[in-house]
Each structure stands twice: as structure tokens, then as C-alpha cells.
């Protein structure tokens, strides 16, 4: 459940706002941050969610206090988070309203079970939030229950994206400076043994004793400079020195293979199914927005950070 809701809210949180607002605002008290079809979202409700998001941000290994004032997508990161928390709350309210209209229900037992799981990841989550998340989850499941992917679609995707399923086997010699790399490259061009030179000179302690053998790796694993050079090599070909953040690499290709369709069919199916479901959910959500009266009052948001 947690992952499904996160996926939906990610549509909002990546900065793609799914919420449109009524241009004519009605007067509300200073404690109201939004009104969705007549239902108010208070600053207290907003604070609950904001604190949970803040806790997750501040628990990240790269967190520093000045992050809130840093520029992100053309605005202060704090303003970005505030706007997107508000949009996510509006989205939740709208979806819960729709779930209730469809007479979707959640039992106390379901809430208790999910709450016990969720609180391990989010210490500030409440049972009422869990109840709403479960209602949304069931609504999204209802929206997407008939979504399927055919074998023809799976095969077509595989045939059109075979490069994505390439797996390379290679060796490399990593050294710290360009001159050493050039010297080793020239010796290789004269026919010296790659594995022997890797054992003698490579500073990659994880592979040097195996003659620089990196084993198999797909696209997206190595740093970009290394990957581009490696996958451009023909079988047995040796690259000129390639500079990366780690130093200078000399790479030898030991061949590229493509994973067979049957091996990657499940991965493709999951990807295409999720893609189709997300499109259906977005279409349904856009319809809800158009049929709703939504007002936001960001000026009433009160939060503290740092």
C-alpha cells in the first residue's frame, strides 16, 4: 500500500502539479490552507504531513540545514516542499472523497495491520492517515483493475529496446595518472598480456588480482564515461585511457550479449503495467479535478525548519 500511494504522490512531488484551482477565492479563516469541494484542510492537518516529509528529508545522509534555502527548480527548496505538500494534501482529500462516493470502505483490522507496518518507516503517521491511504489504495486498484499487458506488447518493447538488455563482460586497468595509463596502453598495443599488467599496475583492489576482470554488467551501472567507452568496444578491443572520477581506465571488451526475452519478460511486464496504470490514474484524477471546486490558500501555511 505504502509504495502505491508513494507512486501516485510522486506524480505531484516531482513538480508536475495535478491540481487546478478556482480563480475566485472565498473568504476563509487564517487556519485553512485549502478547501476541496467544501471540505477544509486546516493548517494543523498540513503541519502533520509537513513534519513527516521534513523528518524524511532531514534523515537523509546528505542533509544539511542550508538545504531549505537552496535553489530548486527555480525557487527555494522550502517553498517547493511547501507547495507540493499542499498539492498532495489536496489530492488525498479529493481521492478520499471519491472513494467514499463509491462506497469503498476500510476495516479497523486493515488499518491496524497497515499502521503497524508503516510506523516502522514513519514514526509520526496516524491511524486516520492510514485509513485515508487505504481508501485511496482501494480506489486506485478499482481504477486499474482491468489494465493488462499483452504478449505482443511485451515482445514489441523488447525488440525496440534491446540495447537496454545488453550485458557486457570486460576487464580494466585503473591507474591514478594519465602518463602511467598511456605507458600501459602502449605496452598493450605491442602485445603484452592485459591480465598480467592489471595485476601489476591496477589500483582497483577489487579486481586487480583477477586480472582486472569486472564480470558482467548492464547499462546504467558504471559511471557514464566508463560505460560509453566500454559499450563502444568490439570483442577483444582495448580502449585508450578513459578519465573518470576514479582515475584513468584502460578497458578491454570480452563481449556483449543481450539477455533473452524470457529472462527479462517479467521486468518488462512490471514496467509496462505500472506505466499503463499511472496513465489511467492520471486521467481519472484529471477528470476529478475538472469536476471539483478546489481553492488553495498557501499564505496561511505556517511551518518551521532548520
Swiss-Prot record:
A lipid is attached at residue 21 (S-diacylglycerol cysteine). Keywords: Cell membrane, Isomerase, Lipoprotein, Membrane, Palmitate, Rotamase, Signal. It comes from the Bacteria. It is found in: Cell membrane. Residues 165-255 form the PpiC domain. One of its GO terms (cellular component) is plasma membrane. A lipid is attached at residue 21 (N-palmitoyl cysteine). The keyword Cell membrane applies. It is a lipid-anchor. It catalyses: [protein]-peptidylproline (omega=180) = [protein]-peptidylproline (omega=0). Gene3D superfamilies: 3.10.50.40, Porin chaperone SurA, peptide-binding domain. One of its GO terms (molecular function) is peptidyl-prolyl cis-trans isomerase activity. Its EC number is 5.2.1.8. One of its GO terms (biological process) is protein folding. InterPro entries: Foldase_PrsA, PPIase_dom_sf, PPIase_PpiC, PPIase_PpiC_CS, PrsA_foldase, Trigger_fact/SurA_dom_sf. The keyword Signal applies. Belongs to the PrsA family. This is Foldase protein PrsA. It comes from Caldanaerobacter subterraneus subsp. tengcongensis (strain DSM 15242 / JCM 11007 / NBRC 100824 / MB4). The gene is prsA.
Amino acid at each position: 500500500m505504502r509504495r502505491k500511494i508513494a507512486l501516485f504522490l510522486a506524480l505531484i512531488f516531482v513538480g508536475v502539479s495535478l491540481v487546478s484551482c478556482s480563480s475566485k477565492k472565498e473568504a476563509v479563516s487564517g487556519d485553512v490552507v485549502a478547501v476541496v469541494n467544501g471540505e477544509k484542510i486546516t493548517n494543523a492537518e498540513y503541519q502533520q504531513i509537513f513534519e513527516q516529509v521534513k523528518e524524511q528529508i532531514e534523515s537523509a545522509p546528505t542533509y544539511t540545514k542550508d538545504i531549505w534555502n537552496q535553489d530548486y527548480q527555480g525557487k527555494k527548496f522550502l517553498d517547493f516542499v511547501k507547495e507540493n505538500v499542499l498539492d498532495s494534501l489536496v489530492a488525498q482529500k479529493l481521492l478520499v472523497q471519491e472513494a467514499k462516493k463509491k462506497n469503498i470502505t476500510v476495516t479497523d483490522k486493515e488499518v491496524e495491520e497497515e499502521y503497524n507496518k508503516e510506523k516502522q518507516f514513519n514514526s509520526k503517521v496516524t491511524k486516520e492517515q492510514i485509513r485515508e491511504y487505504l481508501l485511496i489504495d482501494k480506489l486506485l486498484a478499482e481504477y486499474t483493475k482491468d489494465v493488462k499487458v499483452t504478449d505482443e506488447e511485451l515482445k514489441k518493447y523488447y525488440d525496440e529496446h534491446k540495447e537496454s538488455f545488453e550485458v557486457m563482460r570486460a576487464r580494466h586497468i585503473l591507474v591514478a595518472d594519465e602518463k602511467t595509463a598511456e605507458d600501459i596502453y602502449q605496452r598493450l598495443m605491442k602485445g603484452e598480456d592485459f591480465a598480467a599488467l592489471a595485476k601489476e599496475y591496477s589500483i582497483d583492489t577489487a579486481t586487480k588480482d583477477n586480472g582486472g576482470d569486472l564480470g558482467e554488467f548492464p547499462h546504467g551501472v558504471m559511471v557514464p564515461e566508463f560505460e560509453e567507452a566500454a559499450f563502444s568496444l568490439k570483442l577483444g578491443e582495448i580502449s585508450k585511457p578513459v578519465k573518470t572520477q576514479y582515475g584513468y581506465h584502460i578497458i578491454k571488451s570480452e563481449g556483449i550479449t543481450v539477455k533473452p526475452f524470457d529472462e527479462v519478460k517479467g521486468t518488462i511486464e512490471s514496467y509496462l503495467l505500472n506505466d499503463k496504470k499511472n496513465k489511467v490514474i492520471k486521467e481519472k484524477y484529471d477528470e476529478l479535478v475538472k469536476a471539483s471546486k478546489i481553492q488553495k490558500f498557501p499564505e496561511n501555511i505556517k511551518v518551521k525548519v532548520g
